[in-house]
């Protein structure tokens, strides 16, 4: 049984002769940076607008609004907003809160972010239970921009070939 070739082999040889590996690597890296910056910008914008990815936050309790003097969630000190970042590693990117980032009280921002993203129930020894509802600020943005991120990678690949 022989092997049959199909497709435009002359075109394939021409494309591969130009060593697309280095150009493809660069294009993918540039798309990765573009996507990471897009997501960081939109996560921050979503927090400020109180609707990351178009999904409105659960409203604050009246007692919280009175104590804070504001009805806006996640922006009273600005530490969470300023801690949202990206880290590029070759053709990968991390977008969110880096471990080791702390606020002025020494609290890990990644822990605070997890509580905000997923919610929490805190039981005090006095018997009082505080329920913090989830106010997702990362996942809704990543879902909303999923197709744009994919398209950015497609364009990067097309630019090489």
Predicted regions and their residues:
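Short, Lys/Arg-rich flexible segments
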Residues: 1-161
């Amino acid at each position: 049984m022989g092997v049959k070739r199909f497709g435009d082999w002359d075109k394939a040889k021409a494309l591969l002769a130009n060593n697309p590996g280095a150009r493809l690597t660069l294009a993918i890296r540039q798309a990765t940076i573009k996507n990471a910056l897009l997501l960081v910008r939109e996560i921050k914008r979503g927090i400020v607008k109180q609707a990351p990815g178009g999904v409105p936050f659960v409203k604050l309790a009246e007692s919280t609004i009175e104590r804070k003097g504001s009805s806006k969630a996640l922006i009273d000190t600005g530490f969470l907003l300023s801690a949202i970042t990206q880290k590029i590693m070759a053709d990968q990117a991390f977008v969110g809160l880096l471990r080791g980032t702390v606020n002025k009280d020494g609290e890990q921002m990644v822990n605070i972010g997890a509580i905000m993203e997923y919610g929490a129930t805190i039981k005090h020894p006095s018997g009082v239970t505080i329920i913090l509802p989830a106010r997702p600020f990362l996942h809704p943005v990543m879902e909303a921009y999923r197709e744009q991120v994919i398209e950015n990678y497609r364009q990067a690949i097309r630019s090489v070939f």
